[in-house]
Amino acid sequence: MCDAIQIRLASPERIRSWAERVLPNGQVVGEVTKPETINYRTLKPEMDGLFCERIFGPVKDWECHCGKYKKVRYKGIVCERCGVEVTESKVRRHRMGYIDLAAVVSHVWYLKGPPSYLALFLNMSSSEVEQVIYFHSYVVLQSTTELVQPKQLLSEDELIILEERLANQPFQVGIGAQAIQYLLQQLDLDMEIRVLRNQLFHAKSSKREKLMKRLRILDNFASTGADPSWMILSVLPVIPPDLRPMVQLDGGRFATSDLNDLYRRVINRNNRLKRLQEILAPEIIIRNEKRMLQEAVDALMDNGRRGRSVVGANNRALKSLSHILEGKQGRFRQNLLGKRVDYSGRSVIVVGPELKLYQCGLPKEMALELFQPFVIQRLMAQGLANNMKAAKKIIQRKEAIVDQILHQVVKAHPVLLNRAPTLHRLGIQAFDPILVDGRAIQLHPLVCAAFNADFDGDQMAVHVPLSVEAQAEARLLMLSVNNFLSPATGDAIIMPSQDMVIGCYYLTANNPASQAKQSHYFADFEHVLMAFEQKQINLHTWVWVHVNNNLNIILERSALQEDWIQTRGESLFLKTTPGRIIFYQQAAYHVGFYNLTINKSHLKELVKTVYNLKGMACATQLADDLKQLGFHYATTCGLSLGIEDLRVAPSKQKIFQWAQQAIEKTEQLWQRAQITHVEKFHKVVDTWSEASETLKQEVVRYYEHTDPLNPVYMMAFSGARGNLSQVRQLVGMRGLMADPHGQLIDLPILSNFREGLTVTEYLISSYGARKGLVDTSLRTADSGYLTRRLVDVAQDVIIRQADCGTLRGIAVPVSKALIGRVLAQDVNEECKRNQLITADMLVALRDTKQVIVRSPLTCEALRCICQLCYGGNLAYGHMVDLAEAVGIIAAQSIGEPGTQLTMRTFHTGGVFTSAQTASVRATLDGVVTYEGRCKSTRTRYGQEAWLLETSTPLFLQNDGQQHRYDFQAGTVLLVKSGQRVKFNTLLAYLPTSTRFEKATKSVDAHNAGEVVFDQLKLEQNLVKKEGILWILSGQMLHLPAGSELLVSNEQQIKPAQVLAQSYLRSRAKGIVQIHTNQVELILDRLSFEVKEPFHFHSGDGQIIAEKFEHQTPTGGQVFHRNGQIWLVPAAIYEVSSQKDLVDIKHGQFILANQRSICGVKNELSGWVQLVKQNEVIKEIRIRPGIYLPKVKTNQLGFVQSHLLLSSYGINAYTRRFCYVENYEQGILISPVYVFAGVSPPKIVAKSRWLSLVMYQTCMFQHQQWVKSYKKVYLMRCQLQLKVAPQAPLNQVTVHKEKNRREWRLSYFSNIKLQAFQTIKWLVKNHQRVEADVPLALIQLVSAFNGIVRYHPMLNRLLVVSDQDVITYSIGKPHHFQIGDVIRIGDQISHGLVAKTSGFVIARDANQIQVRIAQGYFLSRETICYVKDGDLVNEGDHLASLVFEQVKTGDIIQGLPRIEEILEARKPKNSCELAQFDGVIQEQSLVSDDGRVQAIKGTLIVCEGTRVQAGEPLTDGAVNAHEWLQIHFNNAVPYRGMVEAARESFAKLQAKLLHQVQQVYKSQGVDIADKHIEVILRQMTSKVILDDPGDSDFLPGQLVYLNEIASYKHVIFHPVLLGITKAALNTESFISAASFQETTRILAQAAMEGQIDQLRGLKENVIMGRLIPAGTGAKYL
């Protein structure tokens, strides 16, 4: 086997050598010269064709083409008759051919990039090279004059002019691929590289990028030793015929690979070009043929890369060589990375509760088929069959012996079970098969979690490992009992669930209903169980039992020991139940006595403890015991769910009343304009969230005390199925729901599913439910794609060495997450460097806050990770083995939960759970003091608060007691310094790490009125000082446009008083027509009486009517002669199938109505004429007329009938003219119909501006055949309405009467009367008026008493009526002044409370008048759209409140977020980062050394704050690329290049690790840090060289940091690669090509002569080798 693979450009000679073979007679074969494939009669390949046996080898094993040699004994002989070598037919899979091209062509991969290699080599643009190759432009090859430069492009015209001008100064031009080949041959690569290096030294940054790219490609290419001109092909290889097969289908037709069609096109065009060159055809024809050949080769190489795709018979683009390689169905992914597996089967799975953990049930029928070869071998070995055929017959007869042998064969032979999708390695596990009846595979219930299987119709595949090695691997590594822990987290994945959990829960439950009146005491556990079996006590009866003093008793955390354990003398008594004793004896005896109700988490803890203490064998046995125990008692408890079990807590209504009252208070605060609309919304939402949470706790308490064995309660609280949220929805309330955009609907669903939802509630809840289902289907695909990218980026990360020797590490806080890590530094005597941290070691580290551990991120091993830096293997709990493929495990660990999360979206059905902000409360009564700088703000509920701008301690003091709270900047304080507070008072909200986004909420006017600002200050529409926007109510009246106001501002008005009036005037001279809601002014009208059968169109387009004339008796041929239309008749029938031609012959005479033609009865007598098209009969024409056989005449065409016919002795002929034509062996004289010709356009009616014009057109052209056997109209007459260009408008309406049509040119004025408007007509209907005459008077009339307010800019009138004023009789002197604000709920006097808010507008001694007002509180940064004093209408947009809201953390945001982080995408609206350490001063950052960075956006840090480099200064997401560069730039002066890169990478890695974990943790998913670290290592291990210094690398090259670290004078910068980019930039071109962009990767690899060292897994799988990991590693 090879150790490495190189890919390079092939020379023409090399291509020929692949195919050429010399026959014994000296003939050289290999060139394919014919486009034929197989002979259609013999079905054998054509010689020298695309399937030629002489070139590619015989079609049948050991048989030549002509059949002279048949049998293996002639092996190696070449037939002297047909030239075919007698050999195996499989040589047709690897023998190649070639096509010698008549003209060179370019390879499309190197022409059409990106990048275009031909353009880069020649230093031309890709479009210029394309123009030359496709014969659009000439290129100058050599020149002796300065007027034309080499490589200059010339058009045909330019070339002719230059040739004339420079006749004495010769220059050479070329065109096509030949010209490009010449230029490439002239290229001196070494010289070009030297020039480029020199240019690069002096180049500016703008040019450097292109120069570096060109230098990199030329330098790499030069090292391959290839010739650039080989990119132009003169010989085209033909791939072996078995890779482009042709197969015969059932119906005798053939199906062939698209490649054969593409090769055929190339060969046809090549042969045609050769012929044209031989006959010296004109240059233009040859050029065209060369271009077509170039296009044919392009299509073969990569169809559709340039121009339109070549399509096959069914209009489908043909699959070219490139398409065969790339994509999911391509060669790499379909056939090399994934193959169909022999010895496999699949079937539905069912549960096998009786199975052991390492067993599976295999259907006998399937086992017999899978293990048939083994059974046959045993039958033959035992002498029961002499050969395979006999053995197979025994099996088919199903003899008893077969069953026995099958049991023997299967007994010690493990099988692999796989469930798709295989998201992690636990998706394939090995089991010992147990033969079962039926056709379903039986699966152990405990392995379902690993397979993510359930029994609702899932299917699984079975694979049989054949070799001894494969069986050993299956048994030792893949057996289900060996996969006890999850590789992603290290937790047990074999876990009792569902029924098993319910059984254990029921067994150990506390049931008050089954308690005895007096206490029972027992001597030991056996006596208790004896009493239980004798039914003296039941499963849940409390008993006191004597126990050993050294028994480990595990109680509930909240339990008091004296309630459960009594000491009497030296004896110890335990209060427990028979159920808990059974659980101890059968399951928990390894750990201790669990004297509590067992739920899922207890079982998980028990299994993990046993695994850690006793090892895998014990844990496996325990798992099986728990399964048996759980299933038994799940059956015993007979759990069933009835509607009566869904009991609603009686306290529900009280909770709702409390919530309703709280919301009413909030509503009143809003109406009093003390909080904004958004603050009200937040308060309402949080009130309902709190109510929902309280109700949930009440439900729990209710079930716990009244019915602990309730099925719903048991399921949710044991962890068997469902959760508290679902129980709350069933028996509490559904709560708040989200709309399709993820925004909350503040109308909660108060009902639960037990009570049933109202229609409104059902509609609200349908949003979330649907969103969940849609999201699931959309995101599952995304998650699979993420896993694929992760696998590709990390597939070559393998543990290849024991220790890299690094001294670096990462700081990790002491927690359970440390288990499996290796210490990087000594901590104490027990914990030394390079020691693996175990659970026991954590105890020794408990006094340490954090430790430095080794990590994949800091490993200095090149192209791998060392054992110590990786640490423990989470799946086995010991140090990771050498050759472990940790990259794949990491990718699966991150990808698999992504899929799980997407699939789990819909289970809560869009129910909203509020994200509570962390808060701090007072721990004692006392006085608050603090000194930090803070600014005033408001909480999300509108409470007054203070935002800390600096980190500050807060002290709470009382009688010598003092508590200190350390608050960081961003904390919101709810108390002032010096304020006295009570115990448990809310002091502060802590800043959260939650991601916020800006949002707006519009404020609309609830009533019409006048705007008044109260303490509100604006700057350019932005609220700078918060305050209240009041709308003083009134009736809004809209003034008609152009109206005259009849009242003055502040005037008192009465009912029926006219306030304003306006006139409706005529726009032009015309007749008035009054309609219900509009008035029409008719400027012009035109009438037309319908005498003829015109078909009138209903639209008022230009063509308003049409009719048809000149009906023919049948179809025929139309001629235009002498201004007339002449028709030579013929009935024409279209032939659709061969049946139509039965009994019909050319020249036959057919009588009318005697027979049917093409399924239609023939109505015309005449002679049959059959019309062919492409040798196929398409039409039958019946030609009436006189046929004169054996007659010849010169008078063909149109002839006067009597002149012609009289000469042949025919007297009677009805038509004046006839048409003569040759027919069969004589002439046919056809009659001619003559019709009047087309008349010029004629005006049929006219008025001042309108006219009706008649147009005639013939529908058939001269000599056109009218294909019909029925009557046809020849002439179309159209009436067109024309409006004169000088008319004032062109809006025409049509009016119908019985026989008349009238068209009117009219103006329409809509009359839409608003409220309080009246209209008086000043003209009569149908009256003629002049221009600008008043037609009507529109008046605005008052309906009530009041005062007028007028706003001239808005054309609005406000009437403050009695309805807008409330009078309060106080009955005694008062303190109210005019202008005072009274708010709703204010006490005006004893027993008198304000019903609405308003302003005092009048007062006297005993009463006040208040004008009703609605207030809106506007916070800072609100955008206000109205000004003080404006008049607004109900529904007008007043302002937009700007606020921050939490981004919802559903995985629908989560998965794209993970993708965003791992793909290292640059955010759209990124924030501005501090480029260096410094202080904020006046919208800029100033460093200590005087550097200044101007800041463009809105600052999110306060003036005078000190910030570190890389900190965000403005709003937006952080751009990780920029962040990395800033940290690198700041570290370089102090740390040097390599250390600065490592340091900046380390900071970025920590940041990205935290971000990824944050997304997964928010969904409750655990992933070990080290898996994410492995992926991040791949993303942050490379740098881009700016100056290669003394290294052999090139500028702009991507290099491993660890590889470049040893060189001096190297200048580089670190780069963060997204996972896709990192996967494509791997060192293995085979791996990269099988991932994405196959053709680009292969083209680049060939240009650079890349060598694949076959280090990773993918490239070895593709090459068919053992993978260099696990048991396939070289050292094993």
UniProtKB/Swiss-Prot annotation:
The entry's keywords: Chloroplast, DNA-directed RNA polymerase, Magnesium, Metal-binding, Nucleotidyltransferase, Plastid, Transcription, Transferase, Zinc
DNA-directed RNA polymerase subunit beta', as annotated region: 1-582
Residues reported to bind Zn(2+) 2: 804, 859, 866, 869
Residue numbers binding Mg(2+): 454, 456, 458
Cofactor binding note of this UniProt entry: Binds 1 Mg(2+) ion per subunit. Binds 2 Zn(2+) ions per subunit.
Coiled coil spans: none
Gene Ontology CC terms: chloroplast; DNA-directed RNA polymerase complex; mitochondrion
More details: In this algae the rpoC1 (beta') and rpoC2 (beta'') genes are fused into one ORF. This seems to be the result of evolution acting to reduce protein size rather than horizontal transfer from a bacteria. Thus this is considered an atypical member of the bacterial RpoC family.
Protein name stated in the entry: DNA-directed RNA polymerase subunit beta'-beta''
Organism classification: Eukaryota, Rhodophyta, Bangiophyceae, Cyanidiales, Cyanidiaceae
Gene designation per UniProt: rpoC
